[in-house]
Amino acid sequence: MVLLDANILIGAFRPDDPDHARLKAWLEATLRDGVPVAFPALVEVAFLRIVTHPRVYRSPSPLAEAVGFLQAIRASGLFREAPWTLRARERWWAWCRDLGLHGDDVNDAYLAAVAAEARCPLVSRDQGYARFHGLDWLDPAAAH
């Protein structure tokens, strides 16, 4: 199983994303290879908020199209719920405290904790995940 960050979903969905072809191909290959994918509700919210936002895109995505993209992943038979456990919460708090995190970095620590406790790689274009000791993560846009 891999846990997807919103930026992977956005890149795979939006044709105007600079890494669209690579991220779409990666996501399609992952599902074709039978690898389960997960993302917490927070990632779905971020995805929908960003791709439909008129201040982010000149031509924001229609909500129905964006929801359809998420529903297709969920209906693939390979979608798994990302568990939010007490251990994940404690790891999240510890990383926030120990790394002195605030703002957007708190969200990153949350995703990292969910992935770490699920013992699966976090897939993101955000290089900042390297700071979370013990987290397995990868950036498919950087892979060659």
Q: What is each stretch, according to the model?
A:
Residues D5, D108, D126:
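Acidic active-site catalytic centers that drive phospho-/nucleotidyl reactions
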Residues M1-F39, P54-G68, A118, H144:
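Short, well-structured N-terminal submotif of metal-dependent ribonuclease cores
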Residues A38-A41, A82:
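Short beta-strand segments at enzyme active-site cores
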Residues T52-F79, L86, W95-R97:
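Active-site-proximal, substrate-binding regions of enzyme catalytic domains
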Residues M1, L86, A112-H144:
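Acidic, PIN/NYN-like endoribonuclease modules and their adjacent C-terminal/linker elements
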Residues F13, V51, H133-D136:
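Short, flexible helix/strand-to-coil boundary loops that buttress conserved ligand/catalytic motifs
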Residues L78-V123:
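Active-site neighborhoods of divalent-metal-dependent phosphate/nucleic-acid chemistry enzymes
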